[in-house]
A protein has these predicted regions:
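A conserved catalytic-loop motif detector
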Residues: 168, 176-195
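Active-site helix/loop module of the DD-peptidase/beta-lactamase fold
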Residues: 4, 23-61, 88-90, 116-153, ...
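Non-transmembrane alpha-helical segments in soluble domains
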Residues: 18, 34, 51-54, 87, ...
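Structural recognition of the beta-strand scaffold that forms the well-ordered cores
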Residues: 52-55, 100, 137-141, 155, ...
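Solvent-exposed loop and edge beta-strand segments that line ligand/cofactor-binding
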Residues: 42, 94-101, 149-157, 227-231
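Active-site-proximal alpha-helical segments within enzyme catalytic domains
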Residues: 105-112, 152-175, 233-242
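Active-site SXXK
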Residues: 1-29, 53, 109-113, 163-169
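Active-site Gly/Thr loop motif
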Residues: 136-137, 188-241
Length: 242
């Protein structure tokens, strides 16, 4: 049966960014978002790069609060104009300084992907990953409205077995049945904590728990890489235990 990924979708978007770099649609992680989105071509927004979005260090004003009826995230879930909502955000902290978990950063990545590739995020996902990993079922991505855009920060829908295939793909460093689907070099960087960023929620200590849209922890001496959704959705990867 289908299950909503919630924020595990963020980790999927990260994989697609790697594919887009390999395909030449995005020049590098340090390419500016304003190259793709004119709303980010001037002022402080012009400083923001693809890397800043991947590492949740954009410095944007997005209010992530889930318990508020009026937060930006609530508007994203229930509103019908997600593109405008995310493009209207302002810079409140210098980009590239602080890890601050913002769903808007991932949504912006999806807009970059769509603009860069000329394809919907769903179509690009189907082409680059889903059709190549032996997925047993179709996947669905919720839209903000009929004929709208994907809620890329959340709301990818498939079954547990096919979510596990995503985990296996990452464990294999982007390879599936001998084919390199996501660039290994990209994943090697993606799966490293961004210790050069101050962790806002942990008092400014170096960020050990997050990379490029993937989480990290340790369990019984083993490194654990994981995608996480707010309502208990997880893809766990423990490389040392295969």
């Amino acid at each position: 049966s289908y299950s909503n990924s919630f924020s595990m979708a963020k980790s999927i978007i990260s994989l697609l960014v790697g594919c887009a770099i390999e395909d030449g649609y995005i020049k590098s992680l340090d390419q500016h978002v304003g190259d793709f989105l004119p709303e980010f071509a001037e002022g402080n927004k012009a400083k923001i790069t693809v890397r800043h979005l991947l590492t949740m260090s954009s410095g944007l004003s997005w209010d992530e609060a889930y318990s508020s009826l009026f937060s930006t995230t609530t508007q994203a879930y229930y509103g019908k104009f997600l593109r405008k909502l995310v493009l209207d955000q302002n810079v409140v902290t210098d980009p590239g300084k602080e890890f601050n978990y913002l769903s808007g950063d991932t949504q912006l990545l999806s807009l970059v992907l769509a603009q860069a590739t000329g394809k919907t995020v769903s179509d690009y996902m189907s082409e680059k990953i889903w059709s190549r990993i032996g997925a047993e079922h179709y996947a669905l991505w919720s839209l903000d409205r009929k004929d709208g855009i994907e809620k890329a920060y959340c709301c990818f829908n498939t079954n547990a077995r096919d979510y596990a295939r995503i985990g296996q793909l990452v464990l294999n460093m982007g390879r599936w049945n001998g084919e390199q689907i996501v660039p290994e070099e990209y994943l090697a960087e993606t799966l490293q904590p961004t210790t050069y960023l101050a962790d806002k929620d942990l008092g400014g200590i170096p960020t050990e728990r997050y990379g490029h849209q993937w989480w990290f922890t340790n369990h019984r001496g083993h490194q654990v890489i994981f995608a996480r959704g707010i309502l208990g959705q997880y893809i766990f990867i423990v490389p040392e235990l295969n």
